[in-house]
Amino acid sequence: MKQRLRQCDADVEIILICTNFNRLKDYNLLQKTIEETLQMKHIIQGIHSAVATPVTKDGTPDLRLLSEHCRSLLKEGCHGIALLGSTGEANSFGLKDRITILEAAINCTNAPEAFLPGTSTPAIADTIELTRHAVSVGAKGVVLLPPYYYKGVSDEGIFRYYSGLIEGIGDDRLRVVLYHIPQISQIPISFDLIDRLMKAYPDIIVGIKDSSGKLENLRNLCKRHPKLAVLTGSDPLMLPLLQMGGAGCITATSNLCAEELRVIWDNWGRVNTAGKLKASQDKIVKWRTLSKKYDQLATIKTMLAKRYREDGWLHMMSPLVELQPLQQQIVWSEMKRLDP
C-alpha cells in the first residue's frame, strides 16, 4: 500500500511505503528488503545533523553555543554531526574559523569519529588544507561539493577536480561523501561520474548526500550503487530511503527533531511499528514545514534561540540576515503549538 504525503515543498512528493500485513506477498517482499538493508553495513550510516553554526554579532564563531548544541544532538540520538555544510553557512567562514569550529566541536564531544565536516571551497588548495586537517583530527569522513563557481562543467572536469583533491591529500584514511545539491551548486553529480570515481577510488568514495529532494533519484542511486552510502538531505525522505536500502540522512531539520528521526531509524524494520513511524514522520514534516516558513537557515536559528533560550543563536553570517522581530514571534508561537 502506498500512502502519498504532500510535503511543504510544492515540487516534492514523498512516497511512504507502508506495510500491508494482510498480503503475504507484500510482507515477504518487505521483509527481504529489510533483511538485506540491515545486513548492509555502510561505513557511514545513520542520522547526521547538518548543524547550524552560532556566531556573535561580529561573525565570530560562538564556540560555547556550538559545543552545547553538538553535545545535545548526540544525546538526542544523532549518530553523527555534519558541520560546516549549507545549513552551517560554511562558505561564509574563512579557513581559520572553519578549523577552529571543527576542533572545538570534536573537543567538546570527545568523539571525532562522529564528525562529517564539509571542507569544500572554490580554491582546490584551500579544500585540500581543510580536508587534510579533518583527516588529521580523526573525522570519520568529509562532505565534498563539486567545483561550484563555473557552470556547465563537464563530467571530465569534475572528475579531474575530485581526483586532484584525493591525490593532493594523499592519505589512505580519507573517506569522501559526495554532495549532490544541484539547485544550489548548479553542478549535478551524474551516475556515470559516480561510477568512474568509485572505480578509481573504491576505498575513498564511500557515500553521497543527495539534497535534490527527488525520491526517484534516491531510488536509482540505491539500485545502481548498492555499496555507496546514500544519504538524503531531506528529513521526511529518510524513511522511504531506508526501505530502499539507503544509509540514512544529513539534514537541517535534525537540528530540531533528532529524536523523531531516531525513532524512525530504530523502528522502521520492525513489525507492528506503523503507528509509531507515522507519528514521528508527521512531526518531522511539521517541523520541516515550519523551518521553511521564511528563509530556512534564519528560521532554524530562530527556533534554536527559543529552544536554548539563547538570543545568540539569532545572528547570521553575511549576506544572510536574521528574521524580523514579528517573524520571530510568529515562528516561536508556532513552535509552542507543535511542542506545547
Listing of model-derived features with the role each one plays in the protein:
Residues 4-6, 23:
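Basic polycationic patches enriched in arginine
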Residues 20-39:
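Short, Lys/Arg-enriched N-terminal segments with co-localized hydrophobic residues
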Residues 41-49, 54-55, 60-186:
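Active-site beta->alpha loop and helix N-cap motifs at the rims of alpha/beta catalytic domains
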